[in-house]
Structures are given as structure tokens and as C-alpha cells.
């Protein structure tokens, strides 16, 4: 039972553990009851043997008394006959001879009696000495056995106390095991979570390694591209040198052209003065035109945007109204569901309270049953004490055989008490089994209801969260609708003002267009002259611009290459930092795993130590049971020795009786008359032998009874 408790991986519920304890107690009580039954049966057998021995002794005593009386009657009859025969004168000589023979006979008888008494006294002394020696030896042995029995009882009591302590320690250990199992479950969950984190970190690490390898490849490519770009830059530097040389030559040409341009510029200045006046007028008109065109186009764009915004706002309003109606429907549905869930939760809470009350009642019933079990244990202990008292009474019954009927009545009473206790134990076992089944059913129901209650609570929480979210959504949509309505009103007011400004701008445009037509006619003549000058200038500018563009392109390529290199370096530094962080995280996770493994190993070592303590206690119990078996074997050996001594005594008695018979035969063969006179004497002597034999038998039987009681 202790091993089964210690080896159980999964911890049972407290009610099942209490039921197991009650079952163990019932088993122990049943075992004690069976032992008491066996003891009672032995006691009854011993009483029957005592009664048989008493009957045999009484019958032998009666027979010896009858023989003694018959012998005395025969002696008296013979004496009367002799006295009658002695009165005749013829028998005086015979009478004298007879008297002389009688005196000789009496002397011989007295000598024989003296010799037999001396022999019998010596034999009795020898037997008594042997009996006393054996008795002393046996008493010493019995005292030793009693001491060993007392020691064994003390050890058994100590072991029972140790067992109770061990049971308490086992319960404490089971509680610790449960707490450790919970901690282990928590640590396992934490380990699983940490493993998941480690796996995610490993995946991240692998991804980062892949990214690193990709970036390294990319870096290699970029380095290769850098080398190529550097080579290109070298080539471009050479080209730039060539271009600078060409530029110097072209600048010289430009200086020559500049001189011609100065001449042309002087001519142009005189034309420019004429143009400036007209261009100022044209510029002012163009600026005003451009401004008005821009404003008109801006207004048109704004109007189009406003119209689009109004359309979008109307569409958004429709969508928002649809969303609001849908949200209201969902809100109504969620409110209905919340009401149903609240009602179901109230019902479940009521059922849970009922189940808890029933569970408390079942616990009270279990406590009452445990009290009954304790009462039965106390009664059993009382019965054991009664049995011990009866043993003492049986020891008294060795000396007083007349109180047998009272002991038989007490034995019958004890049997009746044991039968009633057996029936009560069976009833208690059935009640316990039923109570355990009811408790397990109620516990299962309570667990199911708790699980349902938890699920309903979670559903309620989710429904409340969804309701709050939907309310927030509806409020946000209402705010958006209000904002859209306000924006639509502002857009309408802006459109009205823009329409008014557009009408004014169109009128101003018509006026400006008339002025523009007159200015364009003046411009056409000046433009022809400017076009000729600009064409030659543009050719030179184009050549310079082309060269500048080529130089800028090369510089841009260089800047882009440098920026890419810097970006790659920054990426490399970031990746190194992330790698270091990942390595630190991995090291921390490994430390946590190592610490958790150490804690688990310590807990497992503690559990193994407790298991070893349990095994040691069980081994001690087994050793003690072996010692008890050895003591029983010793007792059986002593009984066998007693049987051997009894047989030896029987053989000695048989030899003694045979010697007596031989003496009788010798006495018969010596003289018929002497034999006739010896018959009553032998008959008188037979009760003495019976008396001499009876103490031997009494001693043997007393020794047997003592040993039987010790065994009992």
C-alpha cells in the first residue's frame, strides 16, 4: 500500500485519498478480526482439550476409588473368614502358622512398602527435580519469549507510530509532490514557452544568418561593383581631363565669340531699350493674365474637388448610416445574448451553490463515517483487551476448572460481538463505498459546472468587449458623420463664393485678352530679331550644358555609390548589433533552461530520497515480519521438543507399568497363598500408583497448557 501510494504518478483527489485511508483502516480491522477469530478458535480447542483431560482424570480417579473400595471389602471378608476358621481347635496350629506367616508377610509388606515408598519418593523427587528443572528451564525460556514478545510488541508499537508518522510524512510528501507537480507543470509551461521563444529566436537567428549571408553576398557584389565603379571613375577622370582640355579650347573660342557677342549685345541693348518698355507692358499683362488663369484653373480644380468631396461625403454618409444601422442591429443582438448569458450564469451559479452544499453534506457524512471507523477501532482494541483478560482468566482456569461454563459463555459472547462487528464493518464498508462514489460523482459534476461557468464567463467577457467595441465604433461613426455634414456645409458656402468670384474673373479676362492682342502684334517683330541672336547663343549653351550634364552624371553616380557603401556599412553595424542582442538572448535563455533543469533535478532527487525512506521503512517491516516468523518457528520447535519429552515420559510410564506387571508375575509365581494375600495389598497399592502417576500427568498437562497459552 505504501509502495502504491509512493509510485502513483498522478496525484488523486483529497476525497479519494481519504477513501483509500478508510479502506486501509477497514482492511487492517478485518485482519485483526481474523486474527482474533483464530485466537478464539485456538482458545476453544484448548478448552475442549482441558475438558477432555479433566473428564479422563475424573474417570481414572473414580475407577481407582472403586478398586480401592473393592480391595478393602475383600480384605475385610478374608479376615472375617479367617477369624471364623480360627475358632475351631483343629486350626490352632494352622492359625499360629498363619499368624507367623502374616507377621512375616506384614514385615515383608512393610519392607516392600518402605522400599516402594522410598523408590517412589526417590522417583518422585527425581521427576519433581526434572520437572522443576524443565519447568525452570521452560519458565526461563517462556520469560525470554515473553521478553521477546514484549520487545516485539514495543517494536510493533514503535513501528505503528513510525507508520503513522510515515503516513503523515507521506501525506505531507504527497502535498509537496502536488505542489512540486504544479510547480513542475508551471515550469514545464514556462519551459514550453521558453522553448517556443527559443525556437522563434532560433528561427530569427537562422533568418538573420540567412540575411547576413545574403548581405555578405550583396556586400561582395557591391565591393565588386565598387571596384568596377572605381575603375569607371578612373576612366571618367581621364575623360574629365580630356574634357577640361577641350573646355579650355572651347573657352578660348567662347572668348572670341564673346567679343562678337559684345558687339551684338550693344546692338541688342539698343533694341532692348525699345523692347523693355513693351516687354514691361506685356509682362505686366502676362503676369496679370497668368495670375487670373491660375486663379481660374485653381477655382475650377477646387470646384471639382469640392464636388468630388461632396459626392464622397454623401457616399461615406450613406455607408456610415448603413454601418450604424448594422452596428445597432449587432448591439441589439449582443444585448439579447448578454441577457441570455447573464440568466444562464445566474442559473449555473445557483446550481453551483446547490452542488457545493451537497458536497459539504457529503464531506460531513464522510467525517461521520470516519468517526464510526474510529469507534470500531476503539471497540476492536477493547475486544483485544477483553481477549487478553480472557487469556488471564484461562491461566486462572488452570487451577480452577469449575469456572469453565462462565468462560464458555464469555467466548460465546465474544463470538456474538465479533459477528455483530463484522456486520457493522460490512455496513460501514458499503456506506463508505457509496459515499465515495457519490463524492466522486459530485466532484465530477462540480468540475463540469466550473468548466461551463468559466466558458460562459469568457463568452460574457468577449461579448462585453465586442459590445464596448461596437459602441465605440458607433460613436466614432457618428462623429465622422457630423464632421462630414459640417464639411459639406462649408464646401457649399465656398462653392457659392467661388461662383461669384469666377464671374468677376471672366469679365476681367475679356478685358485683358483685348490688351494682349495689341501687345502680341508688337512682340512678333521683336521676337524675330531675338530669335536670331538666341539661336547662336543656344548652340553654345547646348554644348556647355551637355558637358556639364556629363560631369554631373558622373558626380551623381559617385555620390550614389558612396551613399550605397554607407548604407551597407550601417546595415552591417545594425546586423552586428542585432546578432549580439540575439546571442545575449540565447545565452540568457540557456541560463534559464539550465537553472530550471537544476531545480527539476533537485526536486527529483528529493522525491527519490523520500522513496528510499519509504523503501527502508518497508524493509524494516519485512525484517520484523521475518523475525516474528522466526520466533514462531522457535515456538514450534519448542512444541516439538515438548512432544518428544511427552513421548519419552510415555515410554517411561510404559516401562514402569511393564516392570510392575513383571513384579506381579514374580509375586504370583512365588506362592499361591502369599499371592492371594498380596492381591488386596496390590489393590490397595494401586491407588497410590494412580496418585503417583496423577501429578506427573498434571505436570505434563500443565506444561502443555502453559505452552498452548504462550502460543495462543
Curated annotation (Swiss-Prot):
Summary of the function given for this chain in its UniProt record: Plays a role in spermatogenesis. When overexpressed, prevents nuclear localization of HIF1A.
Family note: Belongs to the CEP135/TSGA10 family.
Annotated region (Disordered), positions in chain: 673-699
Protein name: Testis-specific gene 10 protein
GO molecular function, one term: structural molecule activity
Expression tissues: Expressed in testis, predominantly in elongated spermatids (at protein level). Detected in spermatocytes only at the mRNA, but not at the protein level.
Biased composition (Basic and acidic residues): 685-699
Annotated region (Interaction with HIF1A), positions in chain: 571-703
Name of the gene encoding the protein in the UniProt record: Tsga10
Subunit (UniProt): Interacts with HIF1A.
GO biological process: cell projection assembly
Subcellular location: Cytoplasm; Cytoplasm, Cytoskeleton, Microtubule organizing center, Centrosome, Centriole
Post-translational modification (record): Processed into N-terminal 27-kDa and C-terminal 55-kDa fragments.
UniProt keyword Ubl conjugation, yes or no: no
Modified sites of kind Phosphoserine: 161, 702
Subcellular location, principal: cytoplasm
Species whose genome carries this gene: Rattus norvegicus
Keywords, in A-Z order: Cytoplasm, Cytoskeleton, Phosphoprotein
GO cellular component, one term: sperm fibrous sheath
Amino acid at each position: 500500500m505504501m509502495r502504491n501510494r509512493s509510485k502513483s504518478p498522478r496525484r488523486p483527489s483529497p476525497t479519494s485519498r481519504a477513501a483509500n485511508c478508510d479502506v486501509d483502516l477497514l482492511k487492517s480491522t478485518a485482519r485483526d478480526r481474523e486474527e482474533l477469530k483464530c485466537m478464539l478458535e485456538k482458545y476453544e480447542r484448548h478448552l475442549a482439550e482441558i475438558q477432555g483431560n479433566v473428564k479422563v482424570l475424573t474417570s481414572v480417579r473414580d475407577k481407582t476409588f472403586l478398586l480401592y473400595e473393592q480391595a478393602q471389602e475383600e480384605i475385610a471378608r478374608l479376615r472375617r473368614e479367617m477369624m471364623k476358621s480360627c475358632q475351631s481347635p483343629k486350626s490352632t496350629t494352622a492359625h499360629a502358622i498363619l499368624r507367623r506367616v502374616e507377621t512375616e508377610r506384614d514385615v515383608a509388606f512393610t519392607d516392600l512398602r518402605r522400599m516402594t515408598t522410598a523408590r517412589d519418593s526417590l522417583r518422585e523427587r527425581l521427576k519433581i527435580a526434572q520437572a522443576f528443572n524443565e519447568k525452570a528451564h521452560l519458565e526461563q525460556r517462556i520469560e525470554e519469549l515473553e521478553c521477546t514478545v514484549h520487545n516485539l510488541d514495543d517494536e510493533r508499537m514503535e513501528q505503528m507510530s513510525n507508520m503513522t508518522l510515515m503516513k503523515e510524512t507521506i501525506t505531507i510528501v504527497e502535498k509537496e509532490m502536488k505542489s512540486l507537480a504544479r510547480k513542475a507543470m508551471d515550469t514545464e509551461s514556462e519551459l514550453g514557452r521558453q522553448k517556443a521563444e527559443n525556437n522563434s529566436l532560433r528561427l530569427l537567428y537562422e533568418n538573420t544568418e540567412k540575411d547576413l549571408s545574403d548581405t555578405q553576398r550583396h556586400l561582395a557584389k557591391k565591393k565588386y561593383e565598387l571596384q568596377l565603379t572605381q575603375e569607371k571613375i578612373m576612366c571618367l577622370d581621364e575623360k574629365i581631363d580630356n574634357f577640361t582640355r577641350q573646355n579650355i579650347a572651347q573657352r578660348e573660342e567662347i572668348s572670341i565669340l564673346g567679343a562678337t557677342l559684345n558687339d551684338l549685345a550693344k546692338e541688342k541693348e539698343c533694341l532692348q531699350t525699345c523692347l523693355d518698355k513693351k516687354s514691361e507692358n506685356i509682362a505686366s499683362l502676362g503676369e496679370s493674365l497668368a495670375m487670373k488663369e491660375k486663379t481660374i484653373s485653381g477655382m475650377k480644380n477646387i470646384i471639382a474637388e469640392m464636388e468630388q468631396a461632396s459626392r464622397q461625403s454623401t457616399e461615406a454618409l450613406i455607408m456610415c448610416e448603413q454601418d450604424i444601422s448594422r452596428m445597432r442591429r449587432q448591439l441589439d443582438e449582443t444585448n439579447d445574448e448578454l441577457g441570455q448569458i447573464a440568466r444562464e450564469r445566474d442559473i449555473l451559479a445557483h446550481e453551483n451553490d446547490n452542488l457545493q452544499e451537497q458536497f459539504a453534506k457529503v464531506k460531513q457524512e464522510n467525517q461521520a463515517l470516519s468517526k464510526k471507523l474510529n469507534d470500531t477501532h476503539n471497540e476492536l482494541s477493547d475486544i483485544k483487551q477483553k481477549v487478553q483478560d480472557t487469556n488471564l482468566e484461562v491461566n486462572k482456569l488452570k487451577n480452577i476448572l469449575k469456572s469453565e461454563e462462565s468462560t464458555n459463555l464469555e467466548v460465546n459472547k465474544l463470538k456474538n460481538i465479533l459477528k455483530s462487528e463484522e456486520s457493522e464493518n460490512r455496513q460501514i464498508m458499503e456506506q463508505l463505498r457509496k459515499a465515495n462514489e457519490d463524492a466522486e460523482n459530485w466532484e465530477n459534476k462540480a468540475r463540469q459546472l466550473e468548466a461551463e461557468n468559466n466558458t460562459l464567463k469568457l463568452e460574457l467577457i468577449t461579448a462585453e468587449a465586442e459590445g464596448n467595441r461596437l459602441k465605440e465604433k458607433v460613436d466614432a461613426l457618428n462623429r465622422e458623420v457630423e464632421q462630414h455634414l459640417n464639411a459639406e456645409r462649408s464646401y457649399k458656402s465656398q462653392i457659392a463664393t467661388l461662383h461669384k468670384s469666377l464671374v468677376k474673373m471672366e469679365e476681367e479676362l475679356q478685358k485683358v485678352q483685348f490688351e494682349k492682342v495689341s501687345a502680341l502684334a508688337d512682340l512678333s517683330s521683336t521676337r524675330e530679331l531675338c530669335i536670331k541672336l538666341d539661336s547662336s547663343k543656344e548652340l553654345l549653351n547646348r554644348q556647355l550644358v551637355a558637358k556639364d550634364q556629363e560631369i554631373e552624371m558622373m558626380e551623381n553616380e559617385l555620390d550614389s555609390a558612396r551613399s550605397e557603401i554607407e548604407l551597407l556599412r550601417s546595415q552591417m553595424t545594425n546586423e552586428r548589433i542585432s546578432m549580439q542582442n540575439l546571442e545575449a538572448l540565447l545565452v540568457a535563455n540557456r541560463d534559464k533552461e539550465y537553472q530550471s533543469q537544476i531545480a527539476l533535478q533537485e526536486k527529483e532527487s528529493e522525491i527519490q530520497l523520500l522513496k528510499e525512506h519509504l523503501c527502508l521503512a518497508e524493509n524494516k517491516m519485512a525484517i520484523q515480519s521475518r523475525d516474528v516468523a522466526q520466533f514462531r518457528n522457535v515456538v514450534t520447535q519448542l512444541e516439538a521438543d515438548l512432544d518428544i519429552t511427552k513421548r519419552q515420559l510415555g515410554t517411561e510410564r510404559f516401562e514402569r507399568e511393564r516392570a510392575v506387571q513383571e513384579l506381579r508375575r514374580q509375586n504370583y509365581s512365588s506362592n499361591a497363598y502369599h499371592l492371594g494375600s498380596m492381591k488386596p495389598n496390590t489393590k490397595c497399592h494401586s491407588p497410590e500408583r494412580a496418585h503417583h502417576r496423577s501429578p506427573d500427568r498434571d505436570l505434563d498437562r500443565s506444561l502443555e497448557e502453559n505452552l498452548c497459552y504462550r502460543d495462543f
